[in-house]
Swiss-Prot record:
Binds 2 heme A groups non-covalently per subunit. Binds a copper B center. One of its GO terms (biological process) is mitochondrial electron transport, cytochrome c to oxygen. It comes from the Eukaryota. Cu cation binds at H240, H290, H291. This is Cytochrome c oxidase subunit 1. The gene is MT-CO1. Its cofactor is heme; Cu cation. It comes from Bos mutus grunniens. Component of the cytochrome c oxidase, the last enzyme in the mitochondrial electron transport chain which drives oxidative phosphorylation. The respiratory chain contains 3 multisubunit complexes succinate dehydrogenase (complex II, CII), ubiquinol-cytochrome c oxidoreductase (cytochrome b-c1 complex, complex III, CIII) and cytochrome c oxidase (complex IV, CIV), that cooperate to transfer electrons derived from NADH and succinate to molecular oxygen, creating an electrochemical gradient over the inner membrane that drives transmembrane transport and the ATP synthase.
């Protein structure tokens, strides 16, 4: 029974739960790696050993957080759980493929961990640029294992994307148009399209790298007429849509949370929100070379990528101001989920502003590969994606489990986390502006103060993570059942009770369109 339910599951709720548990576990691994990084940088001098091991930790931290924490939780966990419930579908379109998408991830994770256990590990950074990732600078199997890990994670995501697109287009009630689906459903569909279009390019790039390393091809080796810059173009054509893949489902969740706790029946500017997400998805594909301002492109190319990147700020601004307009005049309930959402809006905006700074090719020449870039993307990920995940988790926890969290503890957790992440990443802007380079385990004494502050902040965040584990334990141990849920008419996922029965919407859903 246990094996049939959890290994061979074809139920979107069980698979969603598996994704959430896997993502939480990977999140612990990723957090542990990040604390190793901050321990190393807490004071000048070396702690872990040589530069290679440090870079292996940095590389693994990135891969674990992106491919095994944020994506499985947001798309796999929340996506699987909520999309079928929100559109009144009995399950996903391809339930067995759904199970396969999940079970490709643990082997992928295993390959990534194996890559750091053999030879010297893959100390390439998550970008895996040749020639550093070639078979000369990285002899041995480490990079090859990392490439195979990425292949598996990529296949998993592509299959998941096909599944979500089919489900969302094909399994709505006949009377419901695409423009009547909730914003989270839209965000997952747009994310799935981005995955479907970008991952094959990554697969091509890393497969060419694999043959360069093992079969003596020269795709990225000038000695045989290749070009390492080609790899960068292929990687970033995936890598830039990827960062929007990481944040778009978060946008969807924040829209739901802000609307719900403002007591509104719909978000402000629904169509504007949809078009903004579609614009962000489209523009995400035509700005990739802003990661490459230092490789020597012509001034016209740089001018284009600078301008195109700045255009993304417009639909993003539409979203931020629509969230604020949703709050306006609402009957605001100060729940923990609302706090995460408000924290998201503020800190994501800060991260967006530093992004606008980095979009300027002339400034980026100076700031590229400094801690300013690290601070920028950690503001949008560590305080954007993670805050959205936390907000979504505390908001939908009663739906997933049938139990309520302790409100006071959840608010204390938010406060500690808020202080921790800001204390960790705000000083990194100063370090970057004074020229401290990324991916280096040691630094001149001049950078000591802000690094120490940053490392202290990381330990505050660790405290918050440990408190979160306690809060979840407390909720599951106390078993306070959910009494009522407000606004179920405009929040379809709550309609079947908390937790919903194993099978929902077994007969076609009746939709009364206003």
């Amino acid at each position: 029974m246990f094996i049939n339910r959890w290994l061979f599951s074809t139920n979107h709720k069980d698979i969603g739960t598996l994704y959430l548990l896997f993502g939480a576990w990977a999140g612990m691994v990723g957090t542990a790696l990040s604390l190793l990084i901050r321990a190393e940088l807490g004071q000048p001098g070396t702690l872990l050993g040589d530069d290679q091991i440090y870079n292996v930790v940095v590389t693994a931290h990135a891969f674990v957080m992106i491919f095994f924490m944020v994506m499985p939780i947001m798309i796999g966990g929340f996506g699987n759980w909520l999309v079928p419930l929100m559109i009144g579908a009995p399950d996903m379109a391809f339930p067995r493929m759904n199970n396969m998408s999940f079970w490709l991830l643990p082997p992928s994770f295993l390959l990534l961990l194996a890559s750091s256990m053999v030879e010297a590990g893959a100390g390439t950074g998550w970008t895996v640029y040749p020639p550093l990732a070639g078979n000369l600078a990285h002899a041995g199997a480490s990079v090859d294992l990392t490439i195979f890990s990425l292949h598996l994670a990529g296949v998993s995501s592509i299959l998941g994307a096909i599944n979500f697109i089919t489900t969302i287009i094909n399994m709505k009630p006949p009377a419901m148009s695409q423009y009547q689906t909730p914003l989270f459903v839209w965000s997952v569909m747009i994310t799935a399209v981005l995955l479907l279009l970008s991952l094959p390019v990554l697969a091509a790039g890393i497969t060419m790298l694999l043959t360069d390393r093992n079969l003596n091809t020269t795709f990225f080796d000038p000695a045989g007429g290749g070009d390492p810059i080609l790899y960068q173009h292929l990687f970033w054509f995936f890598g830039h849509p990827e960062v929007y893949i990481l944040i778009l489902p978060g946008f969807g969740m924040i829209s739901h949370i802000v609307t719900y706790y403002s007591g509104k029946k719909e978000p402000f500017g629904y169509m504007g929100m949809v078009w903004a997400m579609m614009s962000i998805g489209f523009l995400g594909f035509i700005v990739w070379a802003h990661h490459m301002f230092t490789v020597g492109m012509d001034v016209d190319t740089r001018a284009y990528f600078t301008s195109a990147t700045m255009i993304i700020a417009i639909p993003t601004g539409v979203k931020v101001f629509s969230w604020l307009a949703t709050l306006h005049g609402g009957n605001i309930k100060w729940s923990p989920a609302m706090m995460w959402a408000l924290g998201f809006i503020f800190l994501f905006t800060v991260g967006g502003l530093t992004g606008i700074v980095l979009a300027n090719s002339s400034l980026d020449i100076v700031l590229h590969d400094t801690y300013y870039v690290v601070a920028h993307f950690h503001y949008v990920l560590s305080m954007g994606a993670v805050f959205a995940i936390m907000g979504g988790f505390v908001h939908w926890f009663p739906l997933f489990s049938g139990y309520t969290l302790n409100d006071t503890w959840a608010k204390i957790h938010f406060a500690i986390m808020f202080v921790g992440v800001n204390m960790t990443f705000f000083p990194q802007h100063f370090l970057g502006l004074s020229g401290m380079p990324r991916r280096s385990p040691d630094y001149p004494d001049a950078y000591t103060m802000w690094n120490t502050v940053s490392s202290m902040g990381s330990f505050i965040s660790l405290t918050a993570v440990m408190l979160m584990v306690f809060i979840i334990w407390e909720a599951l141990a106390s078993k306070r059942e959910v009494l009522t849920v407000d606004l179920t008419t405009t929040n379809l996922e709550w309609l079947n009770g908390c937790p919903p029965p194993y099978h929902t919407f077994e007969e076609p859903t009746y939709v009364n369109l206003k």
